[in-house]
Every structure is written in C-alpha cells, then in structure tokens.
C-alpha cells in the first residue's frame, strides 16, 4: 500500500524520534510485504547472549515454531536495516508530521493508481538497505556467528528475488523445475535458511509417490547441504524402507 517515497517520509519521522531505529520484515511475503520499524529504549545493540536467554525462556511457555521462530536465525534474520542504513534510505525526504501529513496524501495514489507491484517495491527496498550484523548485534568474540547471520540475510534476499518469477503449479515435478535450483542456491548461501529447505522437503515427499529416484536425489542433496536438520535424512530412511 506504500510507495518508497512515502516510506522514506515515515522512516524520516521515526528516526527523528528514535535515532537508533531498526527495520525488519514481518514476513517473506511477496504479495503483502510488511516492514516493521523498532527501537530500543536504551539505544543499545542487541546482545546475542541476552537474546538467546530470552528465546530459551519463551520456549518454556510457547511453541515458538508456531510463530515461525524455529531458531535464533529465523528471528534475527528478519532484520533488514540498522540506524545508518535507515538514515541513508530516508535521505532528505520530508518528515511526516501531524501538520505536514505527506503520507496521507501520497499513500492512496499507490493503492488506486500503482506504478509497481508490492514485490517490486520490496526488492527495490532490500537492494537499498545494506547493514552489517555488528551494527545491530553484539556477538562478543563469536565472529563466525556474525558471518552466518550475514549469509542468512543474503540468502533471504536471494529467496525473495527468486520468488518473484515463480508461478504456482499443482504438478510437483513442474514446480520443481521452477524452484529447485533457485532454492538450492539459497541453501548453499545459508544452509540455515529454513524457508528454502522446507518447501523442497515437502516437494520431495510428494514426488516420492510418483518418482522415488528423483525424490531420493533431492533428499540426498538436502541432507548434504543441511546435515544439522534431521528431516531429509529421516525421509530418506522411510523411502528406503518402502522400496520393493
């Protein structure tokens, strides 16, 4: 519902109130992308050890997987910008205020006479926003973790860009022709990026009913790329057990 010009004014106003502001994607949806602007009251970065402690406490009360938070990367991988990137994005856009409501006048135009699709605006936004993990998170001496998070962010952006060209198809073999290599490329960038792993796993399971050899090849590749996840290995075992 928003064009990038309106978003720049919103970000400008947010950063005026919260100089340490950050942005994250609420979903990876191409049709209805949702960007969240958040800030900490103390203006500090997030400390990785504290984030892990809070996630562990929350997991005692909630099934975090039901909220799409399978691990810390599923949560922290949603961030797309820190303060510096947001300031650069806002540039010299006019601040949206009560007495200068530029968004209220601009936003309807994007709804009634759009000049682009939501997916196109999302991809354009992600291409503008460049942030390093160290700007948002204090990982202590764990440099490898910061590299993994940066790889996750890169994989997320590649996943979103690849999705813009996909056309849904009820035939799993035809669907795999579209998405297999793009999703595998995403997993090679970051094996921890579940939104690429999960659909391939589901399609391999469906494919096993009609083409066991192709399903086995796909599951083997998934298991090689992400051995830390058990699902592909278990599916391979079931497939072997059902072979004549």
Please place each PLM-identified region on the residue numbering:
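Soluble small-group transferase modules, centered on the S-adenosyl donor enzyme superfamily
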Residues: 23-185, 190-195, 199
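Heptad-repeat amphipathic alpha-helical coiled-coil interaction surface used
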Residues: 180, 200, 216, 236-237
């Amino acid at each position: 519902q928003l064009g990038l010009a309106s978003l720049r004014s919103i970000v400008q106003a947010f950063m005026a109130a919260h100089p340490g502001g950050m942005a994250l994607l609420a979903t990876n949806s191409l049709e209805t992308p949702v960007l969240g602007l958040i800030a900490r009251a103390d203006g500090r970065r997030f400390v990785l050890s504290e984030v892990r402690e809070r996630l562990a406490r929350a997991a005692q009360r909630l099934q975090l997987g039901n909220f799409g938070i399978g691990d810390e990367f599923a949560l922290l991988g949603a961030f797309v910008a820190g303060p510096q990137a947001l300031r650069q994005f806002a540039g010299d856009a006019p601040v949206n205020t009560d007495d200068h409501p530029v968004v209220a006048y601009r936003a309807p135009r994007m709804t009634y006479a759009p000049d682009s699709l939501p997916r196109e605006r999302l991809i354009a936004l992600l291409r503008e926003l460049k942030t390093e993990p160290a700007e948002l998170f204090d990982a202590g001496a764990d440099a490898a973790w910061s590299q993994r998070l940066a790889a996750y962010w890169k994989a997320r952006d590649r996943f979103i860009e690849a999705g813009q060209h996909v056309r849904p198809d009820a035939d799993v073999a035809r669907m795999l022709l579209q998405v297999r290599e793009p999703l595998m490329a995403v997993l090679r960038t970051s094996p921890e990026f579940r939104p690429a792993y999960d659909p391939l796993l589901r399609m391999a399971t469906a494919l096993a009913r009609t083409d066991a050899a192709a399903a086995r090849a796909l599951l083997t590749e998934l298991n090689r790329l992400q051995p830390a996840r058990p699902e592909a290995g278990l599916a391979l075992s079931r497939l072997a057990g059902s072979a004549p």
